[in-house]
Amino acid sequence: MKTQIQAIHAREILDSRGNPTVEVDVTLECGAMGRASVPSGASTGAHEAVELRDKDTQRYSGKGVLKAVSNVNTEILESLRGMNAIDQEQIDHLMIKLDGTSDKSRLGGNAILGVSLAVARAAASALNLPLFQYLGGEQAARMPVPMFNILNGGVHANWQGPDFQEFMIAPTGAGSFKEALRWGSEVYHELKAVLKDAGYSTAVGDEGGFAPALKKNSDAIELIIKAIERAGYTPGSQIEIAIDPASSGFYENGLYHLRSEGRKVDAQELINLYSSWVDKYPIAVLEDGLAEDDWSGWKLLNAALGDRIELVGDDLFVTNVERIQRGITENVANAVLIKPNQIGTLTETKAAIEMAYGANWGAMVSHRSGETVDSSIADLTVAMGTGHLKTGAPCRGERVEKYNQFLRIEEDLGSRAFYAGHDAFVR
């Protein structure tokens, strides 16, 4: 079978926020084709791979991606044509070398990732394998706990509600992914009713979660617990809570600005707040509890809570093995958030997950707030057996597409599928 790359074609499409992004088609000599599209974040880490934008204010307010598209259709195509799509690492490393920068700013992380994912899809198609099996082999059968972001704050809610960006539920007590998805959907709809009864807006944010104008951060947790109970489930044993404050967004001059509560706190005071919540509420996961470069604060946070809950670094690590290695050495967390577009290739994404595993850390795959209907992260999650992922609320097509892909994968696996459940998190 001829799995050499014959053609690569990129185009500018729109993401879920109506902003341009890159879609790539890779065609092999055997006729197999793979298509992938690239997401975009709202709260981005300062150390992420560069998303190449045109900065032409006459088009899409400067957010066009025609330069990235052109880079795929010329330079990248010329370099990769004739290469074997099955040689994923070789292809990814060639693109990194071709770019020549540390942050993929010349060709664009969005251009490179689109090609990287489309190559994997084309190779899987040529071999007549589902993507998760192509990436993970026969043993890939662990279904993840879905972390549903059902209540939004921070930048995802235009700072109209809680300071903390995401309040999630994790149905760890379910027996399968299919059951977990149902539980999540039921709680989501109960939360809508709870908010309506309390006189709050039920408009949804970028990731499908509700964005009510709450006065206190803890109100979000109280409302979610009420919704869990109203849906007929037990907080803690059946459904746990996860929080992503995205703290870099409210960190300034060494202090954390809790706008909704009208106060500024230092790292230790914020850690004390988290500790009191972990005592009071069934919280299993805290992501980006402190700012991306507050390394000393993260050490204190891990000392306080690292043996009780999963502490995930997102902006702190940006899926970058050098930063993850520093985190492991300095003992600042116990898990890594994995976003392929933060680093820019499938090979580097897998390396980040493997590094986390090597340190007995957890890895949680994640979407971005500006998504597409590409479901590659669902296949990646099962392929790598990460046991949990977050891809928004059970609402909005670009979020639901990932959840529906897990249903297909679980069905495909049949009796071999097993649900991560309570073992999903490091604690």
From Swiss-Prot:
Lineage: Bacteria, Pseudomonadati, Pseudomonadota, Gammaproteobacteria, Pseudomonadales
Cofactor requirement: Mg(2+)
This enzyme's EC code(s): 4.2.1.11
Residues engaged in binding (2R)-2-phosphoglycerate: 165, 339, 368-369, 390
Quaternary structure annotation from Swiss-Prot or TrEMBL: Component of the RNA degradosome, a multiprotein complex involved in RNA processing and mRNA degradation.
Residue numbers binding Mg(2+): 244, 287, 314
Localization per record: Cytoplasm; Secreted; Cell surface
Protein name: Enolase 2
CDD domains: enolase
Active-site residue list: 207 (proton donor), 339 (proton acceptor)
One Gene Ontology molecular-function label: phosphopyruvate hydratase activity
Gene3D superfamilies the UniProt entry points to: Enolase-like C-terminal domain, Enolase-like, N-terminal domain
Organism: Pseudomonas syringae pv. syringae (strain B728a)
Enzyme class per UniProt: lyase
